[in-house]
Amino acid sequence: MRVSGRPMLLALLLLLSTVGDPGHAQPRGPADRQTLLRLLVELVQELKKFHIGDSKRLQLLGESDFALGRREATDYGADQEEQRVEIVPRDLRMKDKFLKHLTGPLYFSPKCSKHFHRLYHNTRDCTIPAYYKRCARLLTRLAVSPMCMER
């Protein structure tokens, strides 16, 4: 649990300023002021040391949490079959609806259908939903290309 030093410092200052006999209001000499100043400086230095030590401790804990052990480091690249991420195809109707929303109705001539199918089914841009905007741009550029403009 981390406690902020400022409220504690203010509380100590208030406490030190009110300490004394409640009935007597004595004028304080320069020696009392110097000792009070020394106490405050020591208190501030202790708080700084505490916060620096606390942050170093947190950094050390953070480094050890993410470090790989000797066994983990050797096993990391061992089996490519287990580590391969399998991409699950999404609903193709949703893909089609989204691309039609971005591009509008597109027409591809029969000469261009082979290029369209290669682009639509085999590229990363048209198979991963995060890249559908790129796919829409590529499809519109293909549709307006001279090869595909012929009807």
Curated annotation (Swiss-Prot):
It is found in: Secreted; Cell membrane. GO terms for biological process: cell surface receptor protein tyrosine kinase signaling pathway; positive regulation of ERK1 and ERK2 cascade; positive regulation of ERK5 cascade; positive regulation of neuron projection development. Belongs to the ALKAL family. Residues 1-25 form the signal peptide. This is ALK and LTK ligand 2. Keywords: Cell membrane, Cytokine, Disulfide bond, Membrane, Secreted, Signal. GO terms for molecular function: cytokine activity; receptor signaling protein tyrosine kinase activator activity; receptor tyrosine kinase binding; transmembrane receptor protein tyrosine kinase activator activity. PANTHER family: ALK AND LTK LIGAND 2, ALK AND LTK LIGAND 2-RELATED. Disulfide bonds join 112-148, 126-135. InterPro entries: ALKL1/2. Its main location: secreted. One of its GO terms (cellular component) is plasma membrane. Homodimer. Cytokine that acts as a physiological ligand for receptor tyrosine kinases LTK and ALK, leading to their activation. Cytokine-binding is sufficient to activate LTK. In contrast, ALKAL2-driven activation of ALK is coupled with heparin-binding to ALK. Stimulation of ALK signaling is involved in neural development and regulation of energy expenditure.
